[in-house]
Amino acid sequence: MKTLLLTLVVVTIVCLDLGYTLTCVTTKSIGGVTTEDCPAGQNVCFKRWHYVTPKNYDIIKGCAATCPKVDNNDPIRCCGTDKCND
């Protein structure tokens, strides 16, 4: 009986995948691209092309709770798997 109970606990933990954290590519470091484990509640990676001039833009990447709203008609792409915003 103890073996059955222990087996059920192990199977439950494996199936629930406790502690999963989304990993997104970020542009927080100056001139560099890194990855970041998103904080709890932030389950979306995003990539935004922020236009400075019509032919010049910055790419901003990171984690978010929801897909950020578009400002100034900047294109944005959101996704929900590890490093999908690369």
Swiss-Prot record:
The source's superkingdom equals: Eukaryota
> What functional role does this protein have?
Binds irreversibly to M1 (CHRM1) muscarinic acetylcholine receptors, and reveals a slightly weaker effect on M3 (CHRM3) receptors. The mechanism of toxin-receptor interaction comprises at least two steps. The first step is fast with no competition between the toxin and the antagonist. The second step is slow with formation of a more stable toxin-receptor complex and inhibition of the antagonist binding.
Query: What protein am I looking at?
Result: Muscarinic toxin 2
Q: Does the keyword Amino-acid biosynthesis apply?
A: no
Q: Which cell locations does it reside in?
A: Secreted
Tissue occurrence? Expressed by the venom gland.
Subunit-structure text: Monomer.
Specify the signal sequence span.
1-21
One Gene Ontology cellular component: extracellular region
Q: What does the similarity note say?
A: Belongs to the three-finger toxin family. Short-chain subfamily. Aminergic toxin sub-subfamily.
Q: Which organism is it from?
A: Dendroaspis angusticeps (Eastern green mamba)
Q: What else is known?
A: Negative results: has no effect on M2 (CHRM2) and M4 (CHRM4) receptors.
Disulphide linkage map: 24-45, 38-63, 67-78, 79-84
Q: Which UniProt keywords apply?
A: Disulfide bond, G-protein coupled acetylcholine receptor impairing toxin, G-protein coupled receptor impairing toxin, Neurotoxin, Postsynaptic neurotoxin, Secreted, Signal, Toxin
| MF-aspect GO terms | toxin activity
Q: Where the protein is mainly located, per its record?
A: secreted
